[in-house]
């Protein structure tokens, strides 16, 4: 199912994501974190953090998140080697979301391009506004 979504040009947005998170979380609270390349300012991914993930990120200077699907700490790069060195953390005005400024060590997304390379961002498609279809960029 994930490949159908990740490699498709069909627009299939998951508007129920927050509801799934709410239903899946038992003992933890999370806030969203946008992750941006500190040098290029390119947005790399959107994830969630809880206190444990934030503390781990600060202590180890590696972008770390809370996996809302697995309900566990997600150290980005632990299995792939695609670590994100944490340069700075910013907090929004209402203190209910964060911005991680990072320096990627390799790729970022868990998906790969047609040549088998890890993508540099999870935002590798755009919506054709006329056709409401996705286009790889």
What kind of region is each of these model predictions?
Residues 2-30, 37-44, 49-137:
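C-terminal binding/interaction regions
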């Amino acid at each position: 199912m994930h490949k159908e979504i990740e490699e498709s040009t069909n627009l299939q947005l998951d508007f129920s994501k927050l509801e799934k998170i709410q239903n899946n979380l038992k003992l933890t609270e999370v806030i969203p974190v946008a992750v941006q390349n500190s040098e290029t300012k390119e947005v790399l991914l959107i994830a969630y953090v809880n206190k444990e993930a934030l503390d781990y990120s600060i202590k180890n200077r590696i972008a770390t998140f809370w996996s809302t699907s697995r309900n566990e700490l997600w150290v980005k790069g632990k299995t792939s080697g695609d670590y994100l060195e944490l340069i700075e953390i910013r907090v929004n005005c209402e203190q209910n979301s964060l911005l991680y400024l990072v320096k990627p060590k390799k790729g970022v997304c868990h998906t790969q391009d047609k040549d088998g390379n890890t993508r540099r961002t999870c935002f590798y498609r755009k919506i054709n506004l006329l056709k409401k279809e996705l286009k790889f960029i």
